[in-house]
Amino acid sequence: MYKTKIICLLLGILSGLVFAPIFFIPALFTFSYLCYIVQKSQNWQVAAKFGYLFGFGHFLSGMYWISIGVSVYIADFWWAIPFALFGLPIILAFFISANCTLSFFAKNNKYYQLIFCLLWVLFEWIRSWILTGLPWNLIGYAFSFSEILIQPLSITGIYGLSFIVIYISTSAYPVFTKKFTQLKILLASSMLILTVMVIYGAVRVSTNPTNFTDIKVRLVQPSIPQTAKWDQEEFWHNLMLHINLSENLEPTDLIIWSEAALVVPDDIPQVKLKLLNMLNSTNAILITGGISDNKKHGDQFELYSAMYALDKNNNKLFEYHKSHLVPFGEYMPLKNILPFKKLTHGLIDYKEGDGGLVYIKKYHLKIKPLICYESIFPNFVRTNNEIVDVIINITNDAWYGKSSGPYQHFHISRSRAVENGLPMIRVANNGISAIVDPIGRIVKKLNLNEINYIQGLIPQKLTTPTIFSQFGNFAMLLSIVFIILIHYLLSLIFDE
């Protein structure tokens, strides 16, 4: 058993490499071994241990980069690095352990592998909302290396795609049990599903060329190090870097800066003057991330992470407050119990905003605004494209250096465009800034650590809403029923 535990841990680590930026797709078949070893376990306690070790390795290699974010302020948070590196995998591994525990009780069922896959998606869904939720690196994101293979997102959403991916990934498990009839069924159904996916994706990509609106947009990526972002001595240098990248002889309609690009209120006279000079010279509207408050005092004072728009006459065209906050980063959960401060600058916790949509009247542009972490929640983002024209996602991935974190965050965010049939404008302080069309094609992008800007046009949205945007997880359930039906029909053909 000791040897099997080591194998589970190592295969779990390997399985974490299926995500961006490595996309080591052969590692998906580590899940076939997990499916097999759970069925082979002597009792549910053993199955739970195998699942836990696999899960610990999976989340350790897939989410190690969170510890890099903690190390940015190492003088204050050195003690938190091992908790970030090992603590999160220790907690998240329980979801895979629970999946394996329940799957064990179905080990003699003819449809054991299907049950394993259904439970996998169930626990991914639970992980997306329990304790504020962390739907990061859902297994469906392993296919985001291919714009063709992610097209089912428009029907199933990410949870439906996760079911497809975990089904295919466990299709080789009868190799270990030497049940070759079952192997034929699973491989045949997986090949059929993949074929349908490729045909659907290829047709969708080829029949939906990227069309553009007339709205010109400039995405500014200054790549300011996190240690310099809130440094008072660096403030004017940082602001002028933004302005210098924004001012250009080429005309534009919108200039977009990243999350918390303005770390002070925009009504400070010297700051206001610089911004108005820039906007008058470019004749553009600025959309930027910043901080905002409710203008109250004492116990009623509230601070928000905001996205707002300013025109050349100093009119604030909209203001959006982030509603999905990062625990421990933007606020401290259980603050009365835990004697720690949050990672982000300042002693005051951010407060949740109300979410919603915003509008720029001049361009008749209806926007779904997303600040950083909000883009990972598919149901929060889900929007009928009849009432929205574009998703604007501002973020700051400078926390995570050259790790896999910024790449994973980009591909997760990009998936929201496909799900909703909406273009996405994504602007990072450092990370990956891009113009993405409504089927997930990357029109233009800036890579990690680039100091530059993108000039382009906002792509047009699709003319009809996607199935996922209209029906949400109900469409995902229908896709699962479809795959179960394929599995059942092929079992009738191949069963001896």
Curated annotation (Swiss-Prot):
Top-level taxon of origin: Bacteria
Main location: membrane
EC number: 2.3.1.269
Topological category with respect to the lipid bilayer: Multi-pass membrane protein
Swiss-Prot/TrEMBL keywords: Acyltransferase, Cell inner membrane, Cell membrane, Membrane, Transferase, Transmembrane, Transmembrane helix
Coiled-coil zones: none
GO biological process, one term: lipoprotein biosynthetic process
Active site as annotated: 259 (proton acceptor), 322, 372 (nucleophile)
UniProt key word Iron-sulfur: no
Enzyme class: transferase
Pathway(s) it belongs to: Protein modification; lipoprotein biosynthesis (N-acyl transfer)
Protein location: Cell inner membrane
Stored HAMAP family: Lnt (MF_01148)
Protein name: Apolipoprotein N-acyltransferase
Lineage, highest ranks first: Bacteria, Pseudomonadati, Pseudomonadota, Alphaproteobacteria, Rickettsiales
